[in-house]
Amino acid sequence: NGNLLDNKYIPRIGDNDAAKTVESVKSFDAVGADKSVIKLEYSAPAGAEGRIDYVSFTYNRKLVMQNNFMAFRTGAMKYAVSMQLENATSDIIIWRRSADGECTIIPSEYNDGVLTTYSSNIKSNDELIAVKRNANFPEPQVVDNVSNQNLHSLGHTDMVILVPQSGKLTAQAERLAELHRDADGLNVAVVRADMVYNEFSSGTPDATAYRRFMKMLYDKAEPGKEPRYLLLFGDGAWDNRMKTSEWRGENPHDYLLCYESDNSESKVSSYVMEDYFGLLDDTEGYNLLKDRPDLGIGRLPAITEAQAKAMVDKIVAYSGRKYAGDWKNSILMLGDDGDNNIHMRDADNVAEKIAATDSSLYVNKIYWDSYKMEVTASGNSYPTVRKELLEQLQTGALLVNYSGHGSADVLSHELVLNKGDMSALVSS
């Protein structure tokens, strides 16, 4: 109520931490106040980055029924106790929710506005919820009708193309599907994401629904006729729920979901991987870094129909040999510097496996540590790496694979490649 109760400092998060929890216990006198208003103000110094997950406010008070339902906890208890709920009505029941999620009704007795409970089953820190059975509670609202569908009835399917719910990309996805049907003889199914959610995650958008859908097709297929390809025809967002300021203005129906590692709060140990959707054997999915996908997975990161059309146009041209050339036999491997050469070694391991798999492919290697680094007041740079990389990209390559640091805007700390460079490349 206008009085400062406490100042709490949240320490910085270390490299191996994901979050910090701050607790505070304060006593204050609210005598004479009909209502106590607790206000939380959060500020951070310039350059600091942090997001509050939740604030928990716990206090002791008399058990007086408020509104149509009221949740409270038992606190620490050594013995079985009875509790009295004042301002009660005869239609109130009390539910107990244990730590493991079990819900039971607590026996009680009503007498003249007081509800008394008697139960030896109430434990320390149980959550109790008093509910007026005859009260008017909000009712579920109809959001939309779900049309009849049956993805489980799909037969032999070589390729699945998933498209966003909005349907903006469906026409171009069908165009690409027709190309693969005619040119490659594949059985292709174009499926909207919301249809997958309806059958594999109870209508809730969930990236794992994509995997469950593919596993259904995988398990029911005859030997040798399992799905071979999954194409995610639509862009993704690191904020799947689009709750952050960066994504709040976007329409989630224009995007497909991403699978993110459990440790998604870490800038080092978190990652987005599409391979997850292809781990289809019964024993797979627990060790994501070692399990191997059972089909090829790709994504066309289109948001608008114009972007989708440009991508499909390029695939059609590629299929028709319009841009035939020796670049189709060229592989470009890129390896960042630092970190005890781990990025260069990773890139080289992949390069050697590619060379051993297909002798018709020529592997070009650009490893940062093989070039001279220039040190200036504005930072470190690799001018020769940048020059050779841009030349290789302009010439063309079947595959460009980079191992190292970067972001959505630049490649490596030395800013070897940026978005503007990619926009300047012209097909010839």
Which residue stretches match the model-derived regions?
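Cysteine-dependent hydrolase recognition
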Residues: 1-428
